[in-house]
């Protein structure tokens, strides 16, 4: 017999994200008693195929970035339709919202409106059943803690400096538990501050908590990270590996089909891009590259996958935008070997879970990710454990909007106790082991 968890109230409001921009928060109440609350994140470098984040466009409020229309869509359009529905029927509720919107990219109601409701419904149901969210979504086998992909140095759109590539990250692949992994990252982060100071650089942090110093080249970040790993007492590659998100869609010029490294003053063809990555991977302990070529450069993706696809993780973010149609094309063409999962790129929990399932069936890894505009919401920490993804990307250990996710993962690891698994290098299950 199915438990009746009737949705009795739905309320949305405008709140602020970590960049001081408005975003949507939704509360869903079940049986007049159990509340689920979710806040929606927002990205800085967005893929052209992402679901649409509805903004008001009223320049007199928040420079046009208000979300009162999205809030109104929840309160006036979605709420009347889902009140009375059973919160356990997640797929049905998500599909109903997709139909109510009626567009391919959720531009009518806004992905920020739909996602807020979708996640709040799941949280309300979990609370009503007395289950942690990861267990409600993932069931009895949800036990894998993720390897953090921790952004500790920023360039590109996330920083005002001379580095074209957007994110330089560390992955504690040699740790034995999540708590140890987090400690290794934090220690390396603090050592990086010392390394940067010794070289005369500033140590202010960017949107995601990583340092954003005015480094001289695209390779210097890798040099200082290797030095920081060693100063923290770890072996680069064995204990802590490096991951990159160059966000090359931001560098790609569609007219000439080339990559313009404006800060470096170089233009590269797709062949030269692949060669650029191959050389860096040979020189540094890089285990993962996200968006190594642009979202529409399918030919470049094929070349990159042929060159490095068996050796390192190649993550599609702008390429796939958590979208099963885009992912299916990638699988068919044999490009990339991993997908970045961002809830707000697609806009419902159901579609997110479908994308993860499709990826896993094709032998692709899934990396659950934050956005650069975050809140104190920790849903992604529960999601990554729920689906046993094994990898999470949620910023540096230096801002509460990022640390909130790591702290939630510490709680989950403690709760799981002896059944918790930290995969380490096994998170890259589809690569040839050295």
Curated annotation (Swiss-Prot):
GO CC aspect terms: cell surface; extracellular region; phosphopyruvate hydratase complex
Positions of disulphide bridges: none
Residues engaged in binding (2R)-2-phosphoglycerate: 166, 342, 371-372, 393
Cofactor binding mode and count: Binds a second Mg(2+) ion via substrate during catalysis.
Single GO MF descriptor: phosphopyruvate hydratase activity
Cofactor: Mg(2+)
CDD domains the UniProt entry points to: enolase (cd03313)
Pfam families, A to Z: Enolase_C, Enolase_N
Active site: 208 (proton donor), 342 (proton acceptor)
Binding sites annotated in the UniProt record for Mg(2+): 245, 290, 317
HAMAP family membership: Enolase
Protein family per UniProt: Belongs to the enolase family.
Record's protein name: Enolase
């Amino acid at each position: 017999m199915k438990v009746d968890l009737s949705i009795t109230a739905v309320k949305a409001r405008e709140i602020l994200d970590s960049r001081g921009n408005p975003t949507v928060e939704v509360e869903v109440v079940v049986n007049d008693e159990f509340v689920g609350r979710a806040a929606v994140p927002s990205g800085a470098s967005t893929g052209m195929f992402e679901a649409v984040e509805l903004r008001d466009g009223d320049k007199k409020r928040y420079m046009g970035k208000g979300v009162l229309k999205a809030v109104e869509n929840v309160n006036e359009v979605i709420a009347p339709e889902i009140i009375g529905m059973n919160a356990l029927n997640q797929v049905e509720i998500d599909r109903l919202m997709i139909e109510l919107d009626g567009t391919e990219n959720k531009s009518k109601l806004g992905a920020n409106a739909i996602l807020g409701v979708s996640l709040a419904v799941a949280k309300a149901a979990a609370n009503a059943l007395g289950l942690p969210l990861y267990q409600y979504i993932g069931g009895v086998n949800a036990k894998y803690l993720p390897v953090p992909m921790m952004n500790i140095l920023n360039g590109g759109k996330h920083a005002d400096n001379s580095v074209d590539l957007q994110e330089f990250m560390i992955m504690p692949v040699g740790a034995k538990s999540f708590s140890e992994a987090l400690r290794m990252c934090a220690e390396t982060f603090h050592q990086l501050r010392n390394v940067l100071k010794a070289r005369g650089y500033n140590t202010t942090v960017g949107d995601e908590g990583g340092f954003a110093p005015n480094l001289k080249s695209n390779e210097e970040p890798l040099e200082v990270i290797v030095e920081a790993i060693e100063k923290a007492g770890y072996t680069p590659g064995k204990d802590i590996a490096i991951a990159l998100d160059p966000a090359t869609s931001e560098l790609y010029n569609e007219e000439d089909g080339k990559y313009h490294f404006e800060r470096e003053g170089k233009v590269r063809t797709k062949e030269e891009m692949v060669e650029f990555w191959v050389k860096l991977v040979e020189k540094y302990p890089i285990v993962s590259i996200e968006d190594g070529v642009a979202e529409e450069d399918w030919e470049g993706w094929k070349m990159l996958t042929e060159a490095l696809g068996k050796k390192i993780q190649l993550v599609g973010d702008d390429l796939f935008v958590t979208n099963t149609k885009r992912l299916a094309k990638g699988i068919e063409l044999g490009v990339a070997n991993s997908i970045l999962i961002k809830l707000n790129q697609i806009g419902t929990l159901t579609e997110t879970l479908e994308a993860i399932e499709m990826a896993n069936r094709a032998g692709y890894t899934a990396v659950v990710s934050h956005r650069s505009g975050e809140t104190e919401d920790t849903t992604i920490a529960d999601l990554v454990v729920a689906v046993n993804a094994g990898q999470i990307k949620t910023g540096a250990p230096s801002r509460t909007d990022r640390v909130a996710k790591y702290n939630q993962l510490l709680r989950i690891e403690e709760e799981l106790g002896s059944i918790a698994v930290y995969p380490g290098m096994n998170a890259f299950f589809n690569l040839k082991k050295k």
